[in-house]
């Protein structure tokens, strides 16, 4: 599934007249780059969610005969459903016995997506591609790379289904969801050295074992909320590819760099 419904506010004024998915990089729209990457990896069915200038995306796919693939449109023109709600709405399009790879439309990388799917076979519930890039928001993982929480290092906010991340025992005892750290605990990793603080890449694989959980969620929610709600019950595993080259093309000042990035990947 390709997330292409976003408003692309960080790419204004380009997105005043087109969807983010059709912003060109290296002579082709972002959507083209992601579709071809999926096609090269052997994917045959792709769901693309649409909202902002949705018809432009539909027309682009029609003009290219869906690139020879089975491409389905998950229409969110009535209202953006966010990343989690977008998956929930699109689930009927998928084989309920097979995993789904989710890919943000504005992510370029050197990832071998076929290998990502193979790696995900060792994780029963979900595989999250992560990296050590600098950001304000991080996912928190234990030594075995199982997801334990989320933090905003700028505000000090921590979200986790565990009562505390400061003691070893807390990593095994579930409690009230999203119990925050005390306000003075600004750096949660410092309180629990075994936790790793890693940035989410916008690429992840979800297995059928957790598909039923989406029915318990509202129609509109973020996928990180989903992962945090259930990470104490299911195996949501982070995967860090050490030779990863990845770029988020989400801002105007990254477009020029993105073209050079693509050239370097070739």
For the regions a language model picked out, list residue spans one by one:
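N-terminal nucleotide-binding beta1-loop-alpha1 segment
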Residues: 1-16, 37-41
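Conserved N-terminal catalytic core of the sugar/cofactor nucleotidyltransferase
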Residues: 2, 24, 28-104, 115, ...
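Active-site metal-binding loops of divalent metal-dependent hydrolases
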Residues: 7, 105-107
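Hydrophobic packing residues within well-ordered alpha-helices of enzyme cores
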Residues: 11, 57-61, 214, 258
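Conserved beta-strand segments of alpha/beta enzyme cores
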Residues: 21, 70-72, 235-237
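Catalytic-core segments of class I nucleotidyltransferases/pyrophosphorylases
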Residues: 101, 108, 114-121, 133-134, ...
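Short beta-strand-to-loop element that shapes/binds the nucleotide-sugar donor at the catalytic cleft/hinge
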Residues: 127-144
